[in-house]
């Protein structure tokens, strides 16, 4: 009897993850900071940068940019570069798409928490991110 439901084995081992760059800017006066926290336009942009470190390791950066505006005024800009350093477990068969998807699965939960906390502590609308659709993500090699 054979099992047709093969278990997926991860192709990457997370060695380290950390904030590479973080920026939160509030270009407006305090009067806009204290305004009602509803009816804002929030624009999110995600991208992934993958760079081979050597034949066994890869560095992947998840970039998240968030701009919040109200009535054509920028309330805040939040940018996060969250880096992961990974060991390739199956060097021969691993492709760039697999690296990107697995790396983002490792990095996104922590990046999501950082975005949430920074936006909340910045005094504005709290940004709560949902799971990413990795097929729509822009990849930069």
Pin down the residues of each PLM region:
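N-terminal intrinsically disordered, cationic/polar leader segments
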Residues: 1-141
């Amino acid at each position: 009897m054979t099992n047709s439901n093969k278990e997926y084995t991860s192709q990457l081992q997370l060695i380290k993850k950390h904030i590479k760059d973080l920026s939160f800017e509030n270009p407006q006066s305090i009067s806009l900071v204290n305004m009602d926290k509803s009816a804002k336009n929030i624009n999110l942009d995600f991208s992934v940068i993958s760079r081979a470190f050597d034949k066994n390791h890869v560095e992947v950066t998840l970039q998240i940019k968030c701009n919040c505006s109200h009535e054509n005024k920028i309330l805040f800009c939040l940018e996060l570069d969250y880096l992961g350093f990974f060991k390739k477990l199956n060097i021969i068969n691993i492709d760039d798409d697999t690296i990107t998807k697995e790396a983002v699965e490792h990095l996104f939960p922590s990046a999501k928490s950082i975005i949430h906390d920074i936006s909340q502590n910045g005094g504005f609308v709290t940004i709560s991110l949902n799971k990413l659709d990795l097929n729509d993500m822009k990849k930069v090699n």
